[in-house]
């Protein structure tokens, strides 16, 4: 979502929060306000709009989670022809890729994980209603290992279920792309769930660790980004299996395998080969690489040869000037030299 638009939503809902505190309940006026705002957010499916209207506090967290996923996507692909950008309608989840490619698989997985991560964190911090710490991780004592649940364990199950309800609600059409998107959403959430951390604190006399109090915490989202990038590199091409009578897509199977072998839960899957992302193409959502910075000496994806797709590159020269070798003189002034450096940057034609 556009940064200014997100700030606008935040301030509007902040006003709702003030009204809520003053009145002690969400009045009909506030409900009407939430209805107006939720109808202004682009790209929401009907069920998503209904969640927005019933949980206006949650839509801010959802937007932050989706943005966290988009930011991580841009970081992971910052040196590639595709840098997590696309042509098309802007939504709370960014601009969607029209092709069911491995890039689309990554964007769906990372944003679904981002929403689950943000919702779980907001619950632990007391910033969302109807949720909090994981109640099931309280009071249990493991005598053999000498630890017990304590503190505030992150309720990852709530975050995942909320992400499932909201993110998956945009899949309306009953086609192969829907099955692909739902699988990748779930893969992103599953990776997050599997990387939850157990943190413990020791208790005992004179620094001994007679017993430990433990709780679960969320992993750094950068870790999830790296794992999903690896799964992107190993993404599995699938095809749809249709029901014999209605011919509707039923489930996905790995392509080019005769048996009905399904992909693994945490596999990223795609149904169409990726475009080369060299040129701007509205039909695929590719923005092309014209004007992108490139590295003239690199043989990798960020190198001008690969990034510019053989079109060549432009050289830009500029001089950077700054104060250097500063010395303090008694008394009392600082004297500096002026240093300069000539720099070249290269952009794709």
Curated annotation (Swiss-Prot):
Residues where lipid is bound covalently (O-palmitoleoyl serine): 206
Main location per the UniProt record: secreted
Signal peptide, first to last residue: 1-24
UniProt subcellular location: Secreted, Extracellular space, Extracellular matrix; Secreted
BP GO terms, sorted: canonical Wnt signaling pathway; cell fate commitment; cellular response to retinoic acid; fibroblast proliferation; forebrain regionalization; lens fiber cell development; neuron differentiation; positive regulation of JNK cascade
Molecular function as annotated in GO: cytokine activity; frizzled binding
Processing after translation: Palmitoleoylation is required for efficient binding to frizzled receptors. Depalmitoleoylation leads to Wnt signaling pathway inhibition.
Superkingdom: Eukaryota
UniProt GO cellular component terms: extracellular space
Residues bearing attached sugar chains per UniProt: 83, 127, 295
Disulfide bridge partners, by residue number: 73-84, 123-131, 133-152, 200-214, 202-209, 278-309, 294-304, 308-348, 324-339, 326-336, 331-332
Keyword vocabulary terms for this entry: Developmental protein, Disulfide bond, Extracellular matrix, Glycoprotein, Lipoprotein, Secreted, Signal, Wnt signaling pathway
Tissue: Expressed in differentiating lens fiber cells.
Region: Disordered linker, residue numbers: 238-266
Family: Belongs to the Wnt family.
Biological function: Ligand for members of the frizzled family of seven transmembrane receptors that functions in the canonical Wnt/beta-catenin signaling pathway. Required for normal fusion of the chorion and the allantois during placenta development. Required for central nervous system (CNS) angiogenesis and blood-brain barrier regulation.
Name this protein carries in UniProt: Protein Wnt-7b
């Amino acid at each position: 979502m556009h940064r200014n638009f997100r700030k606008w939503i935040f301030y509007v809902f902040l006003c709702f929060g003030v009204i809520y505190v003053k009145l002690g309940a969400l009045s009909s006026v506030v409900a009407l306000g939430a209805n107006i705002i939720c109808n202004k957010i682009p790209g929401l499916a009907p069920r998503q709009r209904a969640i927005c209207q019933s949980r206006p506090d949650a839509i801010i967290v959802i937007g932050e989670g989706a943005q966290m996923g988009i930011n991580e996507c841009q970081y992971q692909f910052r040196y590639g022809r595709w840098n997590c950008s696309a042509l098309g309608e802007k939504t709370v989840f960014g601009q969607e890729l029209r092709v069911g490619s491995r890039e689309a698989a990554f964007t769906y997985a990372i944003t679904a994980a981002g929403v689950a991560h943000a919702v779980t964190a907001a619950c632990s911090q007391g910033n969302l209603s109807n949720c909090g710490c994981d109640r099931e991780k309280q009071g249990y004592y493991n005598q053999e290992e000498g630890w017990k649940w304590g503190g505030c364990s992150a309720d990852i199950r709530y975050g995942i279920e909320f992400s499932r309800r909201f993110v998956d609600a945009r899949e309306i059409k009953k086609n192969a792309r829907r099955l692909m998107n739902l699988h990748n959403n779930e893969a992103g959430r599953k990776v997050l769930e599997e990387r939850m951390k157990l943190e413990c604190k020791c208790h005992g006399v004179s620094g001994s660790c007679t017993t430990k109090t433990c709780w679960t915490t969320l992993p750094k989202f950068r870790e999830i980004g790296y794992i999903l990038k690896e799964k992107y590199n190993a993404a599995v091409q699938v095809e749809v299996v249709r029901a014999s009578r209605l011919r509707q897509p039923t489930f996905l199977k790995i392509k080019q395998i005769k048996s009905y072998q399904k992909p693994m839960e945490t596999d990223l899957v795609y149904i169409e080969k990726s475009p080369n992302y060299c040129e701007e193409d509205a039909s695929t959502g590719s923005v092309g690489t014209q004007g992108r910075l490139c590295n003239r000496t690199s043989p990798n994806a960020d190198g001008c040869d690969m990034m510019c797709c053989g079109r060549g590159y432009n050289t830009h020269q500029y001089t950077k000037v700054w104060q250097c070798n500063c010395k303090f003189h008694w008394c009392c002034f600082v004297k500096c030299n002026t240093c300069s450096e000539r720099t070249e940057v290269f952009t794709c034609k």
